[in-house]
């Protein structure tokens, strides 16, 4: 199941391989105020994204959006991936995420290999995560996940833009051992 928490508290997960350490360095750089990566993301216009290659088959989709102006079709939907593990880091803003095991979700659109995407029907009983700046959510192939949500407790952030980095890492690079 998904892993989430403050980036600073999850550092031990990246110590297993040199490639994961490269990923961790990128994520820390993105959060470092004033760094080139941090400024690149914070300077994105609303509703834009920029892709950055990280090597070893990894890449980051740096993006900004504001949910207040999102069309219904742009709001969160449940998805999972077969080839990549998602590392979603909030750089600025507050966003809600939902997650549920893929066995508890009904497939709406079958696997699209080109997009590495399975889309699911909405799930009413899913875990809800509040992600603020510095929070990292890691979603694996068995996690149907949806972002771009707001909970009642932080509705006041709805009009503020969200700046984030979504790193796609080939699942073969991830050595998950507790």
Regions found by a protein language model. Name each.
Residues 1-62, 70, 77-78:
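A short, N-terminal "cap"/entry segment at the start of jelly-roll beta-barrel domains
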Residues 60-81, 91-106:
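Conserved short histidine dyad/triad with adjacent acidic residue
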Residues 82-96, 101-102, 110-121, 168-170:
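Short, conserved beta-strand element in jelly-roll/cupin
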Residues 99-102, 148-152, 177-178:
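A short secondary-structure junction signal
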Residues 129-151:
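Conserved metal-binding segment of the jelly-roll/cupin
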Residues 136-138, 155-177:
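A short hydrophobic beta-strand segment most commonly corresponding to one strand
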